A protein has these predicted regions:
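Solvent-exposed, non-transmembrane regions of membrane-associated and secreted proteins
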Residues: 1-238
Length: 238
C-alpha cells in the first residue's frame, strides 16, 4: 500500500536549543546534544551514558548513548525509555507520554507519511535536520549505541540492513557519505517475554535538499506487524 503526500513540504524547522542544553547540563550529566522529532513531543537532551549517574533518574527526561560522540562521529545512536506505550496497539497523540514513548507513533503508516524529520544538535553544537529513511521493529540488543564512528564498508552494510528491515519502503537516497542518526526504544509489541526494539533511522539533509515528504510504502515486513495489531492487545497499567 502506497502512502504519499504528493510533494507536500514539511514546516518542521530548526529551533535554537542552546539554552535548553545549558539548563540540562546543570544536572551534572555529560550533555552532548539535543533531539526533537516531528509530530511528537520528543524534545530531549542527549547524554553520554558513560557519565550518567543513573539512567532511571527522575530529575529530568533524556536520551542517552553508550559511546563517546565527538566531531569525528558519523553515526550517532541514542536510546530512551518506553514505559507505557509498549503494547501491540501503541497510543498516538497522547502528550502525557514521556521520553521516547511517542516514537512508537511511527508504526502507523499515516503518521510516517506526515512526519519524517528529526532536529539533531550534535557534540559540535551544530543543529541540523535529518530525514527518516527507515522504521523497524527488530529483535536486537541496541548494541549499536556503543559505537559512533564507522568506515565506508560498515556504513554501507548498516544502510542496507536498515532498508532490508524497515517496515516501509521510502524513496530516500542514503550513502556512506551521509551523517546518520539512529533512535531506539524498547517495546513489548510481541509480548512481555520478548526483547524487541523499535528503531528509527535518519540521515542528515544534504546541502540544498528540500524538505518535501518522501513516499511511504508498507512492505512485507509490515504484514506480521499489521496482523499483530489486529489482535487488539492494549497497554499495561503502570
Amino acid at each position: 500500500l502506497l502512502y504519499q503526500n504528493f510533494g507536500k513540504t514539511s514546516d518542521f524547522t530548526i529551533i535554537d536549543e542552546s539554552s535548553k542544553i545549558e539548563e540540562a547540563k546543570t544536572y551534572g550529566d555529560d550533555v552532548v546534544g539535543w533531539v526533537r522529532v516531528e509530530g511528537t513531543n520528543i524534545d530531549l537532551p542527549l547524554i553520554a551514558r558513560n557519565n550518567v549517574k543513573d539512567i532511571s533518574v527522575g530529575e529530568y527526561e533524556f536520551a542517552w548513548t553508550n559511546s563517546f560522540p565527538d566531531e569525528k562521529s558519523n553515526h550517532f545512536t541514542f536510546i530512551s525509555h518506553n514505559i507505557r506505550n509498549v503494547s501491540s496497539n501503541p497510543i498516538i497523540g497522547d502528550d502525557t507520554m514521556t521520553y521516547f514513548e511517542q516514537l512508537m507513533s511511527f508504526i502507523y503508516p499515516d503518521f510516517a507519511k506526515e512526519n519524517q524529520f528529526i532536529e539533531f544538535t550534535g557534540p559540535d553544537g551544530e543543529t541540523a535536520i535529518y530525514r527518516i529513511y527507515g522504521v523497524a521493529l527488530v529483535d536486537e540488543d541496541q548494541s549499536m549505541s556503543y559505537y559512533d564512528t564507522f568506515d565506508e564498508e560498515e556504513l554501507d552494510e548498516y544502510i542496507k540492513k536498515v532498508k532490508d528491515e524497515s517496515m516501509y519502503t521510502m524513496n530516500v537516497d542514503v550513502t556512506s557519505s551521509d551523517m546518520l542518526l539512529t533512535l531506539y526504544t524498547c517495546t513489548r509489541f510481541y509480548g512481555a517475554t520478548t526483547d524487541y526494539s523499535f528503531r528509527v533511522d535518519a540521515r542528515k539533509l544534504r546541502e540544498g535538499e528540500n524538505m518535501k515528504y518522501s513516499t511511504v510504502e508498507t512492505n512485507k515486513n509490515y504484514e506480521e506487524i499489521s496482523s499483530k495489531m489486529k489482535e487488539g492487545d492494549t497497554n499495561e497499567e503502570v
